């Protein structure tokens, strides 16, 4: 059973419980894509932009921040071999710079100072622990809180905008709980087509999203109790990384239950090792302690073997996903 829920995880379960299981329980990693790498780098550049003095926040400086961010990001293992050629990487970079040009055309970064950037938000609603990171929080000219999120993709039509605010509503709910102040507005900045969507916050809307996320949480708990995470066929299936191993589309889809069991056992062993590490002398443990019968060397050896088995299983599944 997971201990925390983020807005993105909640949305994922709502969209498709099977996808949620593949990603968060079976822990089948989705490789970083060029689109995701671009989003990460653009977000980093926009965050760093506000480290500069207002009169230095121009397009040229923002482009340089993008290049600096990518130099750091590309060294990560997950971005290794992301591009097949230098030319492909160059085109990718030029597209990233275009997104930043679009940002500069719809918002003037010299005219305000963000209240906070990349802010950790966490809190509890009944038995649910929620946490996540919001891109930016401002105060408008009325002194009211505004929560801002950057999107590197394209904005939907205005009449379809509200579902996209689900995560920001949750952040607003947690901010209200933490600070005792309700944000007045949510803002989504879509960089692909230079569009800003806003939504006024009301107490009714926060009460409603609280009901909605608790319903999702209760459904997650039921899914864990019954071990049933059904696949939900929808319009997003064609873009789902896990489609090749989804039983809806593949009658011979591999059973990932063993992965789930190994992951759960790895978590248990890790917790036991961490508990034993707290004691300099194991002999100090009382005889009736569950830890007294454990051998840390045996636990570490078992962990390594299970981790290798898990990696081999995931590798075979990843081969199917790449076909």
Predicted regions and their residues:
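Metal-dependent nuclease catalytic regions and adjoining charged, substrate-binding loops involved
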Residues: 4-5, 142, 174-282, 288
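A non-catalytic, helix-rich entry segment at domain boundaries
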Residues: 45-117, 285-286, 293, 297-298
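Mg2+/Mn2+-dependent nuclease catalytic core
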Residues: 112-115, 119-215
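Alpha-helical coiled-coil heptad-repeat register
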Residues: 263-277, 293, 300-303, 307, ...
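Nuclease catalytic cores
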Residues: 11, 15-24, 28-54, 93, ...
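Heptad-repeat coiled-coil alpha-helices
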Residues: 275, 282-284, 289, 305, ...
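Short acidic (Asp/Glu) and glycine-rich catalytic loops that position anionic groups and cofactors
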Residues: 19-26, 43-46, 75-76, 148-152, ...
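C-terminal, charged and often intrinsically disordered regions of DNA end-processing helicases
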Residues: 1-36, 108, 265, 273-275, ...
């Amino acid at each position: 059973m997971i201990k925390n829920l983020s807005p993105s995880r909640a949305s994922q379960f709502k969209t498709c419980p099977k996808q949620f299981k593949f990603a968060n329980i079976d822990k089948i990693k989705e490789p970083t894509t060029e689109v995701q790498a671009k989003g990460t780098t653009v977000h980093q550049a926009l965050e760093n932009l506000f480290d500069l003095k207002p009169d230095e926040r121009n397009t040229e400086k923002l482009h340089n921040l993008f290049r600096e961010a990518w130099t750091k990001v590309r060294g990560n293992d997950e971005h290794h071999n992301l591009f097949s050629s230098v030319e492909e990487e160059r085109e990718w970079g030029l597209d990233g710079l275009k997104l930043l040009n679009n940002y500069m055309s719809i918002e003037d970064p010299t005219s305000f100072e963000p209240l906070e950037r990349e802010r950790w938000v966490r809190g509890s609603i009944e038995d649910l622990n929620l946490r996540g990171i919001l891109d930016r929080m401002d105060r408008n000219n009325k002194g009211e809180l505004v929560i801002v999120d950057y999107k590197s993709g394209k904005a939907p039509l205005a009449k379809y905008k509200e579902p996209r605010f689900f995560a920001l509503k949750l952040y607003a709910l947690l901010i209200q709980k933490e600070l005792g102040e309700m944000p007045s507005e949510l803002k989504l900045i879509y960089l692909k087509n230079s569009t800003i969507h806003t939504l006024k916050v009301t107490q009714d809307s926060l009460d409603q999203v609280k009901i909605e996320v608790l319903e999702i949480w209760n459904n997650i708990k039921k899914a864990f109790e019954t071990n049933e995470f059904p696949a939900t066929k929808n319009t997003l299936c064609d873009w789902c990384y896990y489609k090749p191993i989804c039983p809806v589309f593949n009658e011979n889809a591999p059973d990932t239950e063993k992965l789930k069991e190994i992951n759960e056992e790895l978590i248990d062993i890790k917790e036991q090792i961490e508990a034993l590490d707290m004691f300099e002398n194991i002999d100090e443990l009382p005889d009736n302690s569950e830890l007294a019968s454990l051998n840390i060397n045996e636990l570490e050896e078992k962990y390594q073997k299970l981790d290798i088995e898990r990696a081999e299983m995931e590798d075979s599944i990843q081969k199917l996903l790449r076909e």
